[in-house]
Amino acid sequence: MEKSKIKTGIFGGSFNPIHMGHLALANYLCEYNGLDEIWFLVSPHNPLKQQTDLWDDNLRLELVKLAIADYPKFRASDFEFHLSRPSYTIHTLDALHKAYPNREFTLIIGADNWLLFPRWYKAEEILKNHHVMIYPRPNFTIDPTTLPPSVQLADTPLLEVSSTFIRQALAEGRDIRYFLHPAVYERLKK
């Protein structure tokens, strides 16, 4: 009898920096949407975004590791650091499936990214060969009746925290400790 695959969510992002919104969302998806684990894939570059204020790759990875160290269902990953750039999602997913055949991967994206999904490189191939889970974002509405069979709309709480807000608040010297995991906050104070 074949052992069932580990259901693993792929939560890719800049995590510039990781904050409590990322963590609460991932926690909710693990506990309420059937995922066994979530891997935080720290992205070195998003082909659809200008990254003029992107923090160092290794610092962002370190912050993710600090933030998730106390939750066994989360893993920090630098998998995309080792792929050619720009790293397109289809290449990442295909490489993950090849490297980890005992896992069933689900790509986790926000509703804002879902609306841009037709512009993604090889979007149709992603939908044909991979699972996608969409989480809600403020001011972006998705009609679940229009989604392809490989796509699931997760019913998660809306959390309006952004890494841009975090970076701006830190630059202004504001005390925003409750928006960040305590270990991340302490590391950034240094």
Curated annotation (Swiss-Prot):
Function: Catalyzes the reversible adenylation of nicotinate mononucleotide (NaMN) to nicotinic acid adenine dinucleotide (NaAD).
One Pfam family here: CTP_transf_like
UniProt keyword Disulfide bond, yes or no: no
Pathway linked to the protein: Cofactor biosynthesis; NAD(+) biosynthesis; deamido-NAD(+) from nicotinate D-ribonucleotide: step 1/1
Family per record: Belongs to the NadD family.
UniProt source species: Phocaeicola vulgatus (strain ATCC 8482 / DSM 1447 / JCM 5826 / CCUG 4940 / NBRC 14291 / NCTC 11154)
CDD domains named in the record: NMNAT (cd02165)
PANTHER family: NICOTINATE-NUCLEOTIDE ADENYLYLTRANSFERASE-RELATED, PHOSPHOPANTETHEINE ADENYLYLTRANSFERASE
GO process annotations (BP): NAD biosynthetic process
HAMAP family in alphabetical order: NaMN_adenylyltr
Protein name, UniProt field: Probable nicotinate-nucleotide adenylyltransferase
EC number assigned by the record: 2.7.7.18
Catalytic activity, reaction form: nicotinate beta-D-ribonucleotide + ATP + H(+) = deamido-NAD(+) + diphosphate
Highest taxon of source: Bacteria
NCBIfam families: nicotinate (nicotinamide) nucleotide adenylyltransferase
Entry keyword set: ATP-binding, NAD, Nucleotide-binding, Nucleotidyltransferase, Pyridine nucleotide biosynthesis, Transferase
GO molecular function: ATP binding; nicotinate-nucleotide adenylyltransferase activity
InterPro entries in the cross-refs: Cyt_trans-like (IPR004821), NadD/NMNAT (IPR005248), Rossmann-like_a/b/a_fold (IPR014729)
